[in-house]
Amino acid sequence: MVIANPIYDVVFKRLMENDKVAKFFIGTLLEQTIETIEVKPQEFTYVDELAGLAVFRLDFIATIKTENGERKKVLIEIQKARNQIDLMRFRNYLAEQYKKEDSINDEKIILPITTIYILGFKLPEIETPCLKVDRNYKDLVNSKTLTTKSDFVDKLTHDCFIVQVNRITDRYQTRLDKLLSIFEQTNFVDDKK
């Protein structure tokens, strides 16, 4: 039996078209229950003028509402190979998303952003298959962490999740392990045999 590999954009798009799967995927990574979700694949063509190439890309934007009523925009990016040009593309794409207003019930608002990067390569200095980089509010004058949040600050900064596909193992102990197992690459066939 051949199973479609979710690290490929079209396969991941198909998975994310299912609300239940999309809620499970995003909710498991964010460690939150997702009440509502609206996923929109963002299709665009990236032109590398130096190489003379046009590359078709699919990125995913999900607008979610958590069980506590918080709304946020989740950007999901799949990157199969490590490339310096892609790092700049990530940054430009993120900047474009920060510039866009969101619409909830025909009301224009600015949502906080969370990013999820699914990488098909290893970051040599980070050994975990799944990494969370989150915002903490720290009072530098009194050297203590604050629990109070600011809507203004939350909309200027973002949490980030990184999945390193090549570091995923066959460990199935937690809900996150089970989620990551769908990306584990030893079960997939490619043309490199």
Predicted regions and their residues:
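Elongated, amphipathic alpha-helical interaction scaffolds
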Residues: M1-K193
